[in-house]
Amino acid sequence: MRSSCVLLAALLALAAYYVYIPLPSAVSDPWKLMLLDATFRGAQQVSNLIHSLGLNHHLIALNFIITSFGKQSARSSPKVKVTDTDFDGVEVRVFEGSPKPEEPLRRSVIYIHGGGWALASAKISYYDQLCTTMAEELNAVIVSIEYRLVPQVYFPEQIHDVIRATKYFLQPEVLDKYKVDPGRVGISGDSAGGNLAAALGQQFTYVASLKNKLKLQALVYPVLQALDFNTPSYQQSMNTPILPRHVMVRYWLDYFKGNYDFVEAMIVNNHTSLDVERAAALRARLDWTSLLPSSIKKNYKPIMQTTGNARIVQEIPQLLDAAASPLIAEQEVLEALPKTYILTCEHDVLRDDGIMYAKRLESAGVNVTLDHFEDGFHGCMIFTSWPTNFSVGIRTRNSYIKWLDQNL
């Protein structure tokens, strides 16, 4: 009996050691976040083991674990019709809310899920619940795009998928089929999905027939640049779940089919050092010393290497492509973008990407709403149901849907 108690105490201590990580005092539901982070880290470690044994790619294994516990079939309710179909060969899940009696034509949001271009699905419960709620509360048609993921495809194929599906949906006969008002269609996404939504919005500015097709864009803690991994938020939240800095850098390398040997060099900005001439013209477009307010910059200092590793950009030129990093787009591209909503979270390495993009868009004359949550963390908006229900998740979701309701 005594030995059993000792063993139990040891196991509990070990579990507590694995679960506990230091967190900012202001973050929402810290112990729940620790448990969520421990679960995700455990899944990552299992997938890495599977990869090291040569059984499968670690991202395929990790995504299998993630989607196995939450993927669900298209299930309609009295208020929302849900169907799986494809738009020009791209899988989508369509959520049709009931039209308002006084408005026979409905609004619509094209939604792109997050997951580092490699994980998650439009069909997992988190996104299914979010889009169902949006369709019901907005009386709208929500098109959730099931774009292809790394390692099946790499940049820019994910962008091609969302553009193809969106162009198909915007055809007059398709909008008519779903009873959607062509003047009230928006694009939205979270995290990597926010990146793809921003890229799509910019790509549409190059095509005259598509230039004014989208009424708005709503970007939720979007990832927008891969040039500077030492913005104040990257420095402040480098170890904060669920997106530590080294994980974000690896997602970028996965997206570009790059070499993990570059991770440490990129973390200290060796890929965009002063001797990398190809990056020189782009630095001013994300100069956080001028784009961020003093309350955000605090006492953080820029990390700018005099000499670095020019080989990184030579091997991965996509790092400097605005299609991958919408924050570095030219001014005239930004000027053509529609009304924009950007949601940022204080405890997120991507916080400053969103704030800088809002500033650049504002300077370009775009109507921008920046919605910042002091207790938010990356990914929080989809965590609204037990056992992963966070107070900030519910508040961010409600604020996001309220803005869409008022502006779409």
From Swiss-Prot:
Coiled-coil ranges (or none): none
Free-text tissue specificity from the UniProt record: Present in brain, heart, kidney, lung, spinal cord and testis but not liver (at protein level). Expressed in peritoneal macrophages and kidney.
Bilayer topology term: Single-pass type II membrane protein
PTM comment text: N-glycosylated.
Catalytic activity: a 1-O-alkyl-2-acetyl-sn-glycerol + H2O = a 1-O-alkyl-sn-glycerol + acetate + H(+); 1-O-hexadecyl-2-acetyl-sn-glycerol + H2O = 1-O-hexadecyl-sn-glycerol + acetate + H(+); a cholesterol ester + H2O = cholesterol + a fatty acid + H(+); cholesteryl (9Z-octadecenoate) + H2O = cholesterol + (9Z)-octadecenoate + H(+)
Transmembrane spans: 5-25
Active-site residue list: S191, D348, H378
Phenotype seen when the gene is deleted: Mice are phenotypically normal but more sensitive to organophosphorus insecticide toxicity.
Subcellular locations according to the entry: Cell membrane; Microsome
Summary of pH dependence: Optimum pH is 7.2 for cholesterol ester hydrolysis.
Keywords annotated in UniProt: Cell membrane, Endoplasmic reticulum, Glycoprotein, Hydrolase, Lipid degradation, Lipid metabolism, Membrane, Microsome, Signal-anchor, Transmembrane, Transmembrane helix
Main location per the UniProt record: membrane
Record family assignment: Belongs to the 'GDXG' lipolytic enzyme family.
Designated name of the protein: Neutral cholesterol ester hydrolase 1
